[in-house]
């Protein structure tokens, strides 16, 4: 018996059996469909594989990035360092594209933008340095989020922020330090912006937590922060020259007197506020005359300090 089905094909109706008499699909059509399916599967697999390979390569690059930073910190040729750092920063940001939640990379980026802006941009182009500090801050705040400080830190009430900071442990110290450092410099370069000045208390709160958790982190950098903080303003505006001197002394003790930026900042901020020309001159002269590689692991910082000290000494008669 024959009958038409809904598709128009003729079928033979047989008890317990169904046999199609429609023309079979060409082998080429079947092959094309199979190839299409296989190609789709392969493309999906390749996409997933490319993603995982990219992340794997990024993770394997972390030790290389760290080694590169160590080598850069040992550099004493300022022109070479100035020309090389931007490429390193873009490399780090490229790795962040693959690993956006990697706190280590975010901290490296924040540190890099801070160092480049402070060492090579700020003295001649404050507006550009401000943008670089802001980029560093964004990376550091992302690292803080990964470390457990969620939410918009800039929008938090100060008391609420302090409560959240109290819950953080030593693992958050690097992110706290670089966030506070970049934030404070960004504020310093935008003093005419009331919104920026209003955030200073939050940057200070972040660095205060660093002091509480590990005051030796990054060569006692938190003490340098507060040495400048207390020394860069008159007492009527919250300055405290004794506290400032004590903070610089603590930073000097942590580094064995080999980190020249300690004397640089004490002369630049505290000695100028105290109108102490002799201290200003003597400290900066000592910075210039001390070999940059007295502290090999921080030779670049020392070379930058020497360069800045020479510029400050050139203005001594103008200020005193």
Question: What are the language-model segments listed below?
Answer:
Residues 35-41:
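Sec-dependent signal peptide recognition
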Residues 47-50:
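C-terminal motif of bacterial Sec signal peptides marking the signal peptidase cleavage site
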Residues 52-55:
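Bacterial signal peptide processing site
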Residues 63-94, 98-101, 112-212, 221-255, ...:
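Short coil/linker segments at helix-helix boundaries
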Residues 311-320:
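Extracytoplasmic and endomembrane cell-envelope/extracellular-matrix remodeling and assembly machinery
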């Amino acid at each position: 018996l024959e009958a038409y089905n809904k598709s128009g094909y003729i079928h033979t109706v047989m008890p317990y059996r169904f046999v199609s008499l429609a023309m079979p699909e060409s082998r080429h059509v079947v092959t094309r469909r199979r190839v299409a399916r296989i190609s789709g599967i392969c493309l999906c697999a390749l996409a997933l594989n490319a993603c995982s390979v990219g992340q794997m390569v990024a993770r394997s690059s972390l030790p290389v990035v760290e080694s590169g930073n160590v080598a850069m910190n040992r550099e004493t040729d300022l022109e070479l360092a100035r020309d090389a750092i931007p490429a390193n920063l873009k490399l780090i940001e490229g790795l962040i594209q693959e690993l956006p939640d990697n706190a280590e990379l975010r901290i490296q980026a924040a540190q890099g933008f801070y160092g480049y802006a402070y060492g090579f941009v700020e003295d001649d182009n404050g507006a550009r340095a401000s943008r670089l500090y802001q980029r560093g801050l964004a990376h550091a705040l992302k690292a803080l989020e990964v470390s457990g400080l969620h939410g918009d830190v800039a929008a938090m009430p100060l008391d609420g922020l302090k409560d959240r900071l109290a819950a953080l442990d030593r693992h958050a110290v690097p992110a706290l330090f670089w966030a506070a450092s970049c934030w404070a410099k960004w504020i310093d370069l935008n003093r005419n912006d009331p919104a920026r000045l209003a955030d200073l208390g939050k940057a200070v709160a972040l660095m205060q937590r660093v002091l509480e958790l590990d005051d030796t982190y990054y060569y006692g950098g938190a003490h340098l922060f507060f040495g400048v903080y207390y020394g860069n303003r008159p007492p009527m505006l919250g300055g405290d020259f004794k506290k400032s001197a004590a903070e610089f002394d603590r930073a000097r003790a942590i580094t064995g007197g080999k980190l020249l930026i300690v004397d640089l900042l004490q002369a630049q901020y505290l000695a100028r506020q105290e109108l102490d020309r002799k201290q200003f001159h003597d400290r900066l002269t000592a910075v210039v005359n001390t070999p940059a590689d007295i502290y090999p692991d921080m030779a670049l910082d020392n070379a930058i300090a020497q360069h800045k000290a020479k510029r400050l000494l050139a203005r001594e008669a103008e200020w005193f």
